[in-house]
Amino acid sequence: MLDHAAEMKSAAKAGRDGPKPLAGKSVAMIFEKPSTRTRVSFEVGISQLGGTPLMMSAQDMQIGRGESIEDTARVLSRYVDVITIRCFSHDMLLTLAEHATVPVVNALTERSHPCQIMADLQTMIERHGPLDGQIVTWIGDGNNVAASWIEAAARFNFQLRIACPEGYAPPAELTAWARAEGADLVMYDTASEAATGSQTLVTDVW
């Protein structure tokens, strides 16, 4: 996926027409939680791939007036080709995906933010080359974005260092899972220690 994204970005920068896998397709964007960067990047990306983004806030939908997420999933699946959702509850995402008959993309929940991490990984490759052996440091609360970094560390060959305020570490079961999957995960007590020698620093609330 990252290689394909790099090829498409390179073609766009060179002024060449890239593939349009979303040509003639509509993508619903349910944003229960407001956003600037996520919304703009999704809308622009969908348009560049030939699709039509349909922005939908909870206030604009029947879901804001009591319609179940199950019914919303079924109805939207009849109209659109893809559903993206940015919501407060991960369970809402899972329920939507279970009852939809079209692909569902996680644009953020309280547990994870995978699309942001994929974009960050692409930036790391552009700046520093292959991910193998790179060192990334997360400085901040062990929140949803940190969780997605931990999941990425279990899938790619880079070292992830984490420095969190006391009492705000990522869930122990998540870090245990990642290490069992082969993640090179190191916890630090201070941000300065964690940052030393890193190629990439990612910061959040402290």
Where are each of the predicted segments found?
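Short, structured coil segments at secondary-structure junctions
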Residues: 49, 99-100, 156, 181
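A short, aliphatic-rich alpha-helical micro-motif
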Residues: 77, 97, 194-196
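Positively charged, low-complexity intrinsically disordered leader regions
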Residues: 1-40, 44, 112
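Glycine-rich phosphate/diphosphate-binding loop of Rossmann-like nucleotide-binding domains
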Residues: 32-44, 127-204
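Short, acidic/turn-prone active-site loops that include or flank metal/cofactor-
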Residues: 59-60, 108-112, 165-168
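Anion-binding alpha/beta catalytic cores of soluble intermediary-metabolism enzymes, centered on
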Residues: 19, 73-74, 81-152
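Active-site cofactor/substrate anionic-group-binding motifs, chiefly glycine-
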Residues: 26-79
